Amino acid sequence: MTAFADLMAHQRETQALSQVMGRLGWDQETMMPRGAAAQRAEEMAALEGVLHSRRTDPKVAEWLESIDAAGLDEVGRAQIRHIRRAYERASKVPAALAARIARVTSEAQGTWAEARAEDDFAAFAPTLTEVLALKREEGQALAASGNVYDAMLQDYEPGTTGAELEAMFGALRPELSKLRAAVREAKAPPQLTGTFDEGAQMKLTRQLARTFGYDMSHGRVDKAVHPFSSGSGLDVRVTTRTNPTDPFNCFYSTIHEVGHGAYEQNISRDYLLTPLGQGASMGVHESQSRIYENQIGRSRAFTGFLFAQMKEAFGDFGVADAETFYKIVNRVSDGFIRTEADELQYNLHVLMRFDLERALISHDLQVADLEAAWNDRFEADFGYAVDKASNGVLQDVHWSVGLIGYFPTYTLGNVYAGCLNEAMRAGLPELDADLAQGNTAAATGWLQQSVQQHGGLFEPREVIEKASGMPPNEAPLIRYLSQKFGDLYGL
């Protein structure tokens, strides 16, 4: 075998083990008995040790050194780019530190869940302090003399810096605040009332997953506390949650996660269990979930279809017509929870977390002061006070499991989705007629061809520019939100 073939065989086994780690994580969130947490933490730490050893195996460096990348085709060069980046990053982090992070974050997830249930941030603060210290140590190893937060960002959005995000978000925040203020002055649409059987919600939500092209022969939809997607290639799983008085939470969580899942399912099978067999970045991943959920799923055309589906599932639920239903689905409402926020306000939740986590990593904010800082920023941005920790600083799992640098990719995904949506609609003039019939094939097909099939072949910015014909920027998102909510609220 050639050095390249040897390297790719090694990568395939490593990717397979990584998928096993993902299945353990999925099980931890969905099926695992509560009493198994300590053992699962040990299992995941052991597997992380094996993965770290493989990722830092000196043979990888030898293979990389002996391969002439110039002699490879585009796909081969991209594989080498990913492998080299991952090897260099993994080699900078001591194995003992990687294993400790895996163990501590696995245990921290349980501590966070208990503290959240008790609305007690003080009970979680020591654990969060330990997680942040470990992640900061990892970031310092990765950054060398560079910016620690920037080094952390590379795990989720290669090529992006905190300063670039700060500039983009700085342009976005005042526009969102201005539009939000105008909407709050306008007459609000009615709210959904009544109760909706949770079993019927799950039945309809699985139908919606299929409507959006999710392949249930290679996936499944289950319930979890925090909706997420897991896996790649031939095994891609999504979760959702139900609320008897808010079926939209279930349906749109599912559509969102199906956007992630469809991305993974639609990557070229040629890339299966290789570095290219995954999304280009978390921001690009989020662009798919957001465009499925919002630009497609919350469009006037598609909500007309969903209205009919809900009437079939639940009977008369007190909404007179499809136009009223559309307004209810897109109602701008006060609320504390990021994952339940409407399109207009969602990014304000993310920008707050971006600023707070940067301050935590730079030591400008201490964990002891985090809850107060959160509450102050929330009241400044939203105009009302956080009522309890589970609705505030404890609502998200991310920091407990060490996902520092992840939050900004949510808004970056919305920015990317804005660019993609403009290009998609320009190329599909009959799209709304299709969506009104529940036919998403043209939209999902366009995204599959333009974005999803390529997996990690291109760098994130390159993916968006090739697909949309423009460099990533916030202007299309601002145009989309201004037009949509201006129309909805008569601004």
Task: Describe each region flagged by the PLM.
Residues 3, 19-25, 35, 39, ...:
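C-terminal, non-catalytic "cap/extension" segments appended to globular domains
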Residues 39, 97-100, 127, 197, ...:
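Secondary-structure capping and boundary motifs in well-ordered enzyme cores
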Residues 246-262:
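Short alpha-helix carrying the canonical HExxH Zn2+-binding catalytic motif
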Residues 1-158, 482-491:
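A well-structured
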Residues 7, 143, 256, 289, ...:
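Divalent metal-coordination and catalytic microenvironments
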Residues 101-249:
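Contiguous, non-catalytic segments that form substrate-binding/exosite surfaces or channel walls
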